[in-house]
Each structure stands twice: as structure tokens, then as C-alpha cells.
Amino acid sequence: GKAFDDGAFTGIREINLSINKETAIGD
């Protein structure tokens, strides 16, 4: 089954996107 409900998954995805953007800018 899903490890997270939709709300938690969306929150984590948004955090990951933010980290990815910061990493890209840092590079």
C-alpha cells in the first residue's frame, strides 16, 4: 500500500522539489 496519504506525500514532494531547486542553483 501507499506509505503516505496524499497530503503527506504532496508535502514531501514539495520539499524535495525545493531541495532540488536549491541544489541546482548551488551548482
From Swiss-Prot:
Disulfide bonds: none
Keywords: Glycoprotein, IgA-binding protein, Lectin
InterPro entries xref list: Jacalin-like_lectin_dom
Keyword DNA damage among record annotations: no
Domain Jacalin-type lectin: from-to ranges: 1-27
PTM comment, free text: N-glycosylated.
GO molecular function, one term: IgA binding
Taxonomy, superkingdom: Eukaryota
Function: D-galactose-specific lectin, binds the T-antigen structure Gal-beta1,3-GalNAc (Thomsen-Friedenreich-antigen-specific lectin). Potent and selective stimulant of distinct T- and B-cell functions. Shows a unique ability to specifically recognize IgA-1 from human serum.
Family of the protein in this entry: Belongs to the jacalin lectin family.
Subunit relationships: Tetramer of four alpha chains associated with two or four beta chains.
UniProt name for this protein: Agglutinin alpha chain
Organism whose genome encodes this protein: Artocarpus tonkinensis
Lineage: Eukaryota, Viridiplantae, Streptophyta, Embryophyta, Tracheophyta
